[in-house]
Structures are given as structure tokens and as C-alpha cells.
Amino acid sequence: MNTGDKAKSQAVPASGDIDQQALFFHRYPRPGKLEIQPTKPLGNQRDLALAYSPGVAAPCLAIKDNPETAADFTARANLVAVVSNGTAVLGLGNIGPLASKPVMEGKAVLFKKFAGIDVFDIEIDAPTVDRMVDVISALEPTFGGINLEDIKAPECFEVERRLREKMEIPVFHDDQHGTAIIVAAAVLNGLELAGKDIAEAKIVASGAGAAALACLNLLVTLGARRENIWVHDIEGLVYKGREALMDEWKAVYAQESDNRVLADSIGGADVFLGLSAAGVLKPELLARMAEKPLIMALANPTPEIMPEVARAARPDAMICTGRSDFPNQVNNVLCFPHIFRGALDCGARTINEEMKMAAVRAIAGLAREEPSDVAARAYSGETPVFGPDYLIPSPFDQRLILRIAPAVAKAAAESGVATRPIQDFDAYLDKLNRFVFRSGFIMKPVFAAAKNAAKNRVIFAEGEDERVLRAAQVLLEEGTAKPILIGRPQIIETRLRRYGLRIRPDVDFEVVNPEGDPRYRDYVDDYFALVGRLGVIPEAARTIVRTNTTVIGALAVKRGEADALICGVEGRYSRHLRDVSQIIGKRSGVLDFSALSLLISQRGATFFTDTYVSFSPSAEEIAQTTVMAANEIRRFGITPRAALVSHSNFGSRDSESAFKMRTALQLVRELAPDLEVDGEMHGDSAISEVLRQRVMPDSTLNGEANLLVFPNLDAANITLGVVKTMTDSLHVGPILLGSALPAHILSPSVTSRGVVNMAALAVVESSHPV
């Protein structure tokens, strides 16, 4: 790396055209988009001896004796090769293997981002079919699967066919089959909305390259009839007897007809499949198509007809493009990472038609479900509902892997190509959930306990918020809690319809209407009794109880009409804490509230306290917070190991802060003699046992601390934010400690999954108070 590059910022400059921004993005802070990271420690001589000579001989011999154990001892079962010769790079054509490398690196990071699959991009100087087959097939010992990319037709057909015959691992040409799978899912859903049978549907295609023919082949597998398919390319209709630009794959769709141009064939068509060139489908041609036509205009960057032009010509049309700025984007990332995930996990020898069909039906089915909040954000906050503008899911819908990978793995087993069939699909789905929702594994004990107390009522102060509405549906579906939502009924009902959610107010969950609840006067009286001597006059109390939903929720918990409160999705933390403090109050003996935050990173779970409440807690407050935090951590099925962190390392400094932490340690040991705790210590000593042993060999803390206790709010909150951002960690919390009754104040950045997590924790707290 050039030394000058080190100083370059990661941020892409906002000014300049897209090309300049892309060049900057690819060059800084280090060239390219990939790196290799070790998955085993290499910190000492012993590690080196195990990773390499002499220890590495043991797995080598095990694999020699039983080749299937390569999946146990190497990364092969999670490693895919993205292979290209650069002869048909999207939008660029035949630019050669070296120039195609940025595209292949991009494909690699998509595999990793969306499915956790490791990839080597391999660009080969192999212009002929024979050369490609020889080179790629020789890679079989290294990889668990091969993704062919950007190889021109018709060579790509022959390369894939021969490799599939020769290799015992999946070989998948994504340009063909990825596009075909998504197109097939869109066609299934589009025809269903139009009330049409695929066996009777007339399909007109513009384009006869690899992707177009793969789409048509898969539609035939779904039930379309070849006699109803009319294929056009640059030479016009593919008809029987035509000689120009014909090949064996195209010939199967040759029609016995005098039609020659698109205008001859388009009349009465139910589906237009475009994988050709911009502007091919004219408005006057679209006007001649059947009722409720499905338009797949997939030419990039400009489709065969622009959606707004198509809508003007045919308001009843359903339109898919390859562009992200229009609904129904046909983007291969919808499927290829998840198909490979399922294929790799069951040790599939190939990706067959049954597996592709399973993926089609999984994608089509997901579009009929309620979209996730992540998918909604991908649509600029407008939540799509299954219909003409939402035939296929967003590529960012996190549930894709949860639907596609198990379906593919199951189809592989049923069709006899899985070498390691998945025996327990519930456990497999749980594993995938942990990849999608990194909180899944850590939260599992909490959810298990919550389901045993699912009758418990959780009241949500911001009941009109989309994230809360989505969380309420998840809680009801999973049997975790009985939600009570504070909000205006008409707003809640409108938003439930907008977001496509099935839950029904006053049937599935209770609604507390702040504008007209019959308990209003009782709530006002109770509130005034609590705060009347805190400067709140009766008139103000009436206004607050009508307008402050956190106050309403806290009163409901105080009165026993709810078991736990969730608030803070909107507004400042301090305001919500004031209301909770005034109404619910602190648990007996608790000196002050405090907040516990959980970060889940690649290295595991780490808890931080106090991250939100006390600016400069006393030694007594720190000690009490440590014990409360340790008790809370045990709810996760985790044994707490606490480190009281400081700028001082086991007495190295005599500052007021260091003395406070030393005093807190003695108090913690008196309050909780069984708790594994030590301090005061540096942050790196808390994490690294090696460093800690150097300065304090007889430390009472073993291994890596999972609870970091800070001397003040600045240190805790700043560390939390820095670590969260630098490690791309998932934040669970903040968890409010010390309240008399279960109540948690979230942050405005929380996701619906975060709301679900905290609601489940609140249910457990209400059933098993400390």
C-alpha cells in the first residue's frame, strides 16, 4: 500500500460524476473490495505449529483417508469460485479477464454479504470452451461450488454442460439461471394476480441470449407450453427453417409461422420477456397485448420500455425491470447467494431443476408475505404490499436466505444429490437465523423463557410506529407476548393496511387510545398523586396524560394493567427516563437507574454499563450497577465475567477515578462474592487474558471479560459507539436496570427486530423478577 493512500478517507466524495466516485471507492483506503482473514488464532508458536507444520499433517491424512472430511477440516464447504473469462461483462461486452476483475470481486462480496459464503474470484485467460473446461474442472479440489460469470453465448451453454457432467460440485451460470429463477417467480405471481394459467399464457421474448433462453426453459418447466412461446432476436422471429444466427438451444423455440417481426407476434401476449435492447417495446405494441399484461423489460441500463411509458400506454400493466429505481427489480442477488448457501450446506453435487424450482417457489411465496422493515427501508420507507408493484421481494429482504436456502437443501435431498443431507431443518433454520439476525443465538434463552410466559402483556408507548407494528406481529406469531399498543385506532389500522400486516386491533392485540380511553380520569388522578408535588399542576397533568404516551404506558404498568413497558422509539432518552422514574420508580434499595448495552460482534457478546444514565456514579452506585448487570446477563444463559475498567491498571494510578473503581471492586465482592470480577484495569487487559496475566498473574478474572463496567457515562457511551461502528456490531438494548417494574427505553435507531428482542426480555423480567 502506498503511504499516501493510508491518509485517504474511506468516505467517497459527494462531488464528481459516478465514474470518479467509483474509482475513488475502489482505490481507497486499499485497492479492491476483498481481503483474506484467518479464522484461527496465530498468536504464538503453539498456534503456528497447529496451523502449519507439524500439526497440519493430521487433517491432511484424515482427508486422504476420507475425502468427505475436507468439509470438517478446511474451508472448502463454504468456498465458491467466481470464474470468468471476461467475454460478456454486463454493459461492457468482451473486455477480457483482467478488466473483468472488479466485477468478479463485486460478485464475491455479494456472496459474503448476503449469505456468508467465502469466494475467490478467478479470472482466466481462456477464450475457448476446451480451455475453460480444462482450467475450471481442475479447481474441483479447492472449491465447494463454481459460479460461472460473464461468459458469452453460446459458449457458456457448452461450458456449463460439460462442467456439470465432469464435476461433483455445483456449477451454476448465474447470468442464465439466476435471472431465470427471479423471472419465473415474477411470472408466477404476475399471472396469479391477473388470474391466468401459465399453461395458456402467450409469452413473447425479445432477446435469445443465455439469460433469455434460460428464462424460457424454466418457464417451460413451470408449465408454459413451447407452442405459446415466440422468440425474437436481432434477426427477427426464431422460426423453423431460419439459418441466420441459429443454434441448437435457440432452435427448440422455432415456430412454424409467417410472422417475422415483434409487431407480428405481440398481439394478445400475456407476458413480454425483454432481454435485448432499449426501446424495443413501443407503446403501440404494448397496447395490443392481452388484459393485465406482464412486462419484463430487463435490458440494462435502459429497459425495452420505460415504466412510466408503459403505464401511460397500459395502466393495467405489471412491469419489472433490472433497475433499482423502479419497483420489481430483477436483481440476481435475490437468489444466487441463497441457492449456493443451501447447496453448500447439504453438500450438493449439482444444482438441478428441482433445486431451481424450489428457489422459484420460495421467492414467489415470500413476495406474498408481509415485507420486513429492512425491505421497507430499501423502498424509501414506502412499504410495498403484494400486488402489481410488488411481484418479487426486495434484494435486501433478510428473509430471502431463510426461505430459499432450506428449500434448496430440501430439494437437493429429495432429488438425491445431497451428500450431507440436513437432518434437522429446525436447527438449520436456527443457524440461518443467527446469520441474519446476529442476536438470534444470544437471545435464544430469552425467547425460550418468554414463550413460557407469553400471556404477559407488554405495552408499547409508540404504538403507531412501523417498527412497533411489525414487532407486534412477530411477537404474536412467535407466541412471545400479548402486545398492547398506545395510539390512535384509525392511524394504527391505516398503517397496518399500508404495511400489509395481518394483525387486527382489538382482536389480536389491545389498543389504548390516548384521545378517548375511558380510564382517562383515573389515569389523571393517579398521575397527579405521583407528581403533584413535583411542580405539575392538575391542568398540566390532564394534558400530559392525554398526550404523553410514555406516561400512559408507565401508568398502565403501575396500575397492573400491563406487565412491562417499551418506549423510546421516538424522542430523547432523558425525557422517557424522567417519566419512568416518576411513575414506576426505582426498585427498593436501588440507588439509581443505570443502563446495560449488549454488542454482538464476530468475536461474541460483550456487555457495557452504564451507557445512558449516570454521568458520574459513585463507587456504591457502580458496585450496585455491576451486580444488577451481572444478574441481567444470566437471563441470556451467559456466565458474567466483569471487569471494572479505568485509565489505571491494577493500582498504577492514584487518581480519584481510579480510587473510585478500586473501592467499587471491594463493594462488588461484598455484594456478590460468587461473581467473577476484577479491576481496576485497562480496557485491553479486560479483553486479553495474556496482557492481564503479565501485570496481574493472580487476577480473579479468567478469560475474556464479557461485562465492561465504566467509571462514568462519557467513557461508557463513547466506547459503546466507537466499538459498535468499528466492529459492525449489533446493538441490543439499552436495558434499563433498577426499575421497580419492567420498563425499557430504546433508541430511535432501533429496528423492529430490536423491539422484539427487548419486548421478549421485558416479558422474562416480568415473570422472573430479580
UniProtKB/Swiss-Prot annotation:
Residue numbers binding NAD(+): D175, N300
Cofactor(s) needed: Mg(2+); Mn(2+)
Cofactor note: Divalent metal cations. Prefers magnesium or manganese.
Reaction catalysed by this enzyme: (S)-malate + NAD(+) = pyruvate + CO2 + NADH
CDD domains: NAD_bind_2_malic_enz
Active site: K107
Top-rank EC class of the record's enzyme: oxidoreductase
EC number of this enzyme: 1.1.1.39
GO BP field: malate metabolic process
UniProt region (Malic enzyme), positions on chain: 1-440
Subunit structure: Homooctamer.
Record-given protein name: NAD-dependent malic enzyme
Source organism of this protein record: Rhizobium meliloti (strain 1021)
